[in-house]
Amino acid sequence: MKDRYILAFETSCDETSVAVLKNDDELLSNVIASQIESHKRFGGVVPEVASRHHVEVITACIEEALAEAGITEEDVTAVAVTYGPGLVGALLVGLSAAKTFAWAHGLPLIPVNHMAGHLMAAQSVEPLEFPLLALLVSGGHTELVYVSEAGDYKIVGETRDDAVGEAYDKVGRVMGLTYPAGREIDELAHQGQDIYDFPRAMIKEDNLEFSFSGLKSAFINLHHNAEQKGESLSTEDLCASFQAAVMDILMAKTKKALEEYPVKTLVVAGGVAANKGLRERLAAEITDVKVIIPPLRLCGDNAGMIAYASVSEWNKENFAGWDLNAKPSLAFDTME
């Protein structure tokens, strides 16, 4: 049987990425052009800046992805692209590039949900057994998702306010840490002690919902009050206490979800899945089901994960028309 090559595009936020997947599971290339340095001075992603950067580098990313994969444009079988959720301007750049390539070569266009990409990146570790449960944690999302089969997603719990990654960046900004702050907070947390009593919102409530705004506010208030009084707080202890509260919330809700949905596999994915503290808690506390976490290179935004997620859509012949548009607020239950 002839090999299948999927060319995948990811431009939902501040990473321009193009990848090539051979058949179902052989990732031949995964080119990522990061914009972090451009956004650091603003303390967060500026949508217009992100869009301009995508336009500047996406052609080079396509060329590099094909060259690294050792194939030509004529070898590509299908084109996959993130169409949401994300920043509308950023999404449109990837969509325009993907549709142009697909149209020029007469190829099918596969629409992919960005968060499905994060989840299906676990396929790079080993073949996934369904049904499974997924904890998706990133800068824009905190969700528990039940996956009955590849491509069939149901959100069973999500944050009511801030995403966990968003909370990390906001408290990092208060402490004067470099954006994005997640990795630095994680490192500092391992050097400090959990001595500050931060709230664990909704941790005992009988649902699978998350809330991090109260924790964020409590952190900011403690830091602000100390500054007003001229008191010095240990950055390491602040980070350790904040991270302990976050992990307590994530673990409590995940354990409850596993009780309600008896599966054999838990996938933990998204940018925050790179967090060392989270990985340690998962290893220590989730022992009765298999826990699969994508490798670090596939935790952040990348086109490789979009390629993996596109396989189930290819198998279902879920192809999009040329009118496919960006859906910045796309949810799992509104996929094309």
Swiss-Prot record:
The lineage of its organism: Bacteria, Bacillati, Bacillota, Bacilli, Lactobacillales. Binds 1 Fe(2+) ion per subunit. Substrate binds at L136, V137, S138, G139, G140, D169, G182, D186, N275. GO terms for cellular component: cytoplasm. Its cofactor is Fe(2+). Required for the formation of a threonylcarbamoyl group on adenosine at position 37 (t(6)A37) in tRNAs that read codons beginning with adenine. Is involved in the transfer of the threonylcarbamoyl moiety of threonylcarbamoyl-AMP (TC-AMP) to the N6 group of A37, together with TsaE and TsaB. TsaD likely plays a direct catalytic role in this reaction. This is tRNA N6-adenosine threonylcarbamoyltransferase. Fe cation binds at H114, H118, D301. It catalyses: L-threonylcarbamoyladenylate + adenosine(37) in tRNA = N(6)-L-threonylcarbamoyladenosine(37) in tRNA + AMP + H(+). Pfam families: TsaD (PF00814). Gene3D superfamilies: 3.30.420.40. Belongs to the KAE1 / TsaD family. GO terms for biological process: tRNA threonylcarbamoyladenosine modification. Keywords: Acyltransferase, Cytoplasm, Iron, Metal-binding, Transferase, tRNA processing. The gene is tsaD.
